[in-house]
Structures are given as structure tokens and as C-alpha cells.
Regions:
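Post-transcriptional modification and biogenesis factors for structured RNAs
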Residues: 1-188
Length: 188
């Protein structure tokens, strides 16, 4: 057994990725302050072929050296846009037919393992500030909140941001029954 070389992995070029069909989800970043976290979101969005990332509030945007350091080139392939007000981004997504879910601990939140999205509608996942979380007005405008269980006493919210995106999108992306048509098109 040996590790594959990069050229053996069949990865898309930046141009091919931009033209490739994407999975029907968007990532919304609500005032993320860490540039390394922003870059990590770009890498995760690239890995799961997100439609785009919406950078809201004071969330910094590429090009930026610290974002590039953790994005490792994904900031060049993933579409992104800037919106100063996170709630405006959420309202526009809802008007465009998206179901919007905040990744946050809130009253009535759905545990991640129990989440059943409406597969006929695209999803938007909102991730909040590392300290304050998702803004209350954004939670009020969303369709609901997803909660990721934590078992440690001192678990930091920021620690769970990028892994939660990967966990959230992995299930529908791997569900052949729910995404059969897209799966077939993406693997041709």
C-alpha cells in the first residue's frame, strides 16, 4: 500500500471546479473573526462542492495572506460574496427558496443526528462568531437551528465550527438515495 500522488487523485483544476456542478448548499459566515477559521471554511466548502460562501459583517474576504494560509488555494475555487448584514443574506436566501439552518445551541434546536432536510430545497448553513455565536436576529429569521452535541466541560464554540460544517454536509452528500441524480452526474 502507498499514498497516492496528487496527479493520481483525479482532482479538478480551479477552472474545472468552477464549472462543475455543486451540491445544493451555501455556507453563511456571521461575523467570523479568525482568518484561519475563514480559510478552513473555504477548504471544507471546496471539499464538499458548496455552491458558495457568503461572508457577512466583519468577516474578512480573500485575498488575504492568513485566509490563504489555511484555505490552501480553496479561496480561488469556491465562489463567495460579501454581505454586510447577515440577516439580509438570510432573507435573500429564503426568498431564493433556500431552507436556512443556523448551527447554534438554541431553544428548540435539532440535534445534528436527528436532522432531516427537505431534499427538494437547497440548504444554507449559518455559522456564527466564535464567541457570540449566530446573531439573535439571524436565528429569528432562519428556519431552525442545528445543534452539535459536546461532551467536554470547556469545549470552545470555535473549536466546533469547521468540523460541524463537514459533519453537516457529509450526510446529504453521501446519501445516494437523496442525491442519486446528482451523484451520478458528479461521478461521470
Amino acid at each position: 500500500m502507498r499514498k497516492l500522488r496528487v496527479e493520481e487523485m483525479g482532482r479538478l483544476t480551479v477552472e474545472e471546479f468552477k464549472d462543475a456542478e455543486k451540491f445544493p448548499f451555501v455556507v453563511v459566515l456571521d461575523n467570523i473573526r479568525s482568518l484561519a477559521n475563514i480559510g478552513s471554511f473555504f477548504r471544507t466548502a471546496d471539499a464538499f462542492r458548496a455552491q458558495k460562501i457568503i461572508l457577512c459583517g466583519y468577516t474578512q474576504s480573500p485575498p488575504h495572506r492568513e485566509i490563504t494560509r489555511s484555505a490552501i488555494g480553496a479561496e480561488l475555487s469556491v465562489a463567495w460574496e460579501k454581505n454586510e448584514r447577515p440577516v439580509d443574506a438570510v432573507m435573500q436566501l429564503k426568498a431564493d427558496g433556500y431552507q436556512v439552518w443556523c448551527v447554534e445551541q438554541a431553544e428548540g434546536s435539532v440535534m445534528l443526528q436527528n436532522f432531516q432536510p427537505q431534499y427538494e430545497k437547497p440548504c444554507a448553513f449559518v455559522f456564527g462568531n466564535e464567541v457570540e455565536g449566530v446573531a439573535d436576529e439571524v436565528i429569528a429569521a432562519a428556519d431552525g437551528c442545528l445543534e452539535i452535541g459536546s461532551h467536554g466541560h470547556g469545549t470552545r464554540e470555535s473549536l466546533r465550527r469547521q468540523p460541524s460544517l463537514a459533519r453537516r454536509v457529509r450526510t446529504p452528500a453521501r446519501s445516494v438515495a437523496a442525491h442519486r441524480a446528482m451523484y451520478v452526474r458528479l461521478t461521470k
